[in-house]
Amino acid sequence: MAADAAPGPARTSFHHAGMIVAIPFCSVDAPDALALLEWIEVLGGVREHTCLLTLDAAVQWSTASAIAAAAQKSFGNVRIVSTEEPVEGWPAGPNALWLEAARFAQEQGQPFLWLEPDAIPLKPDWMTKLAAAYALLSPSCFMGHLYKTNSEKFPPVVMSGIAIYPPGAIHLV
C-alpha cells in the first residue's frame, strides 16, 4: 500500500456463509469501486456475502478505508487484500489483483465472483441468483460468459474475467 498505508488485516481463515465478491481496483479505479458499492447499497445490499476488496499496493490506505466503509453498508463481511508492490498496466495489474483474490478464496475454501468496478448489477437479488446458479454446478466449475476472439494473442474462445471462480481456481488457470 502507499505511503499512508497501515497494514491490512492479516489473512486469517474465517468462514462466512455465501460467496466472496472480489472487487479489484487500483488508484485510478477507486472512484468507480466506491460508486459500485454505493449502487449495491441502493439495490438493498447482499448481507449474506463477503466483500473482498482486492487492491493494488499504490492505493492510499485512506482511500481503501473509505471504500471499505461503503462496503460494510451492503455486505455481511468485508476483507481487504493487496498486492505487495504496485503493479501497473494491462494485463499485469488486473492479473496480479486476480491472483490475490484467488489466493484468498483458496484459503477460505469458497468460490468467488470477480466483479470489476465497471460491472454493474441491475437487480436487487442479483447476487442471490448468481450464487444459486453456481451452487447447481460442480464445485470446481467456472461460471462466466464465453466469447469468440479474433486475436492471435488469445485462444479462439475465452471466458470473460467477470465470472464466478471455484475455490481452487488459482491452481486451475
Language-model regions, residue ranges each:
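A conserved hydrophobic helix/loop-capping motif in glycosyltransferases and polysaccharide synthases
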Residues: 20-32, 56
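Short beta-strand-to-loop acidic/aromatic patch adjacent to the donor-nucleotide binding site
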Residues: 109-120
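Active-site-proximal specificity loops/subdomain of glycosyltransferases
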Residues: 54-109
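Short, well-formed alpha-helical segments that are part of the catalytic scaffolds
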Residues: 28-44, 62-66
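Short loop->beta transition adjacent to catalytic acidic/histidine clusters or analogous donor-positioning motifs
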Residues: 17-20, 43-53, 76-78
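Conserved catalytic core of nucleotide-sugar-dependent glycosyltransferases
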Residues: 91-94, 119-173
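Alpha-helical elements of Rossmann-like donor-binding domains used by nucleotide-donor carbohydrate transfer enzymes
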Residues: 35-39, 66, 96-100, 125-133
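Non-catalytic N-terminal targeting/anchoring module and adjacent flexible stem/linker
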Residues: 1-16
